[in-house]
UniProtKB/Swiss-Prot annotation:
HAMAP family in UniProt: ClpS
Protein family according to the UniProt entry: Belongs to the ClpS family.
Cystines in this chain: none
PANTHER family with a match to the protein in the record: ATP-DEPENDENT CLP PROTEASE ADAPTER PROTEIN CLPS, ATP-DEPENDENT CLP PROTEASE ADAPTER PROTEIN CLPS1, CHLOROPLASTIC
Subunit: Binds to the N-terminal domain of the chaperone ClpA.
Protein name per its UniProtKB record: ATP-dependent Clp protease adapter protein ClpS
Its biological purpose: Involved in the modulation of the specificity of the ClpAP-mediated ATP-dependent protein degradation.
Biological process according to GO: protein catabolic process; proteolysis
Lineage: superkingdom: Bacteria
Organism: Klebsiella pneumoniae subsp. pneumoniae (strain ATCC 700721 / MGH 78578)
InterPro entries from the UniProt entry: ClpS, ClpS_core, Ribosomal_bL12_C/ClpS-like
């Protein structure tokens, strides 16, 4: 048995099990525009919670501003729920009405 064969575990997975395994459901995390949250705060949120650089964060902030909402990313359910909760909590702590939601992708 070669090293490559030894590392190939594909043969250990039953066909029925392989067919039953499905990728996790994915969810879009969305920022919703409001008339009160400063643009700089939205950029801060996008950098802090979604790891965007300032240029991309600014582009997304403008999408939120002009189109009413923007997708910040697509994640598994647990990650999406955590990001939504963290953004909403951060907004409240800073006394901004910014709303972050999720929807199935």
């Amino acid at each position: 048995m070669s090293k490559r064969d030894w590392l190939d575990f594909e043969h250990l997975v039953d066909d029925e099990v392989r067919d039953a395994i499905k990728p996790p459901s994915m969810y879009k995390v969305i920022l919703v525009n409001d008339d009160y949250t400063p643009m700089e705060f939205v950029i801060d949120v996008l950098q802090k919670f979604f790891s965007y650089d300032v240029e991309r964060a600014t582009q997304l902030m403008l999408t939120v501003h002009y189109e009413g909402k923007a997708i910040c990313g697509v994640f598994t359910a647990e990650v999406a729920e955590t990001k939504v909760a963290m953004v909403n909590q951060y907004a409240r702590e800073n006394e901004h009405p910014l709303l972050c939601t999720l929807e199935k992708a």
